[in-house]
Amino acid sequence: MYRIGNGIDFHRLEINPNRPLVLGGVECESEVALVGHSDADIILHAISDAILGALALGDIGQYFPDTDPKLKNIDSKIILAKCLELMKERNFQLVNVDCTVIGEKPKIAPLKEKIKKSLCSLLDLPVDCVSVKATTTEKMGALGRQEGIGTFCTILLVKNL
């Protein structure tokens, strides 16, 4: 049995030299950071939501509510690990991941290989099963005004026999 999951996440950008920009588990050099209750890693959030969606288990807000002060600044790798644990408990495994980052800034092209390598490690997938792409909104809307960035992610799960 196969299951497909989709995940979407958006966060605002702010100039904050005291907060790192984290994408796909990688701390990226940038003058901007993402605003969020957690480390605001939009890629790991979208992947986590895609896994939960494929399993019909809701979303990360149910497991990691932004109203819980104990979760303030939580590392999104912990969120992803919990979602992978739920997946394995149900005897599924990840087949592939396809992520698209949307925004004008920061430029993703110079970061893609680091992010992809991190995702391969975190997800225990080979390089040819992880895709990281980027696009812009051609300066339209909030993302075009560099107020934030987002990620769309699609994953495929297969049930282990």
UniProtKB/Swiss-Prot annotation:
Pathway connected to this protein: Isoprenoid biosynthesis; isopentenyl diphosphate biosynthesis via DXP pathway; isopentenyl diphosphate from 1-deoxy-D-xylulose 5-phosphate: step 4/6
Keywords, in A-Z order: Isoprene biosynthesis, Lyase, Metal-binding
Annotated family: Belongs to the IspF family.
One protein family per Pfam: YgbB
Entry-linked SUPFAM superfamilies: IpsF-like
InterPro entries: MECDP_synthase, MECDP_synthase_CS, MECDP_synthase_sf
GO molecular function: 2-C-methyl-D-erythritol 2,4-cyclodiphosphate synthase activity; metal ion binding
Alphabetized HAMAP family for the sequence: IspF
Protein name, as recorded: 2-C-methyl-D-erythritol 2,4-cyclodiphosphate synthase
EC numbers for this chain: 4.6.1.12
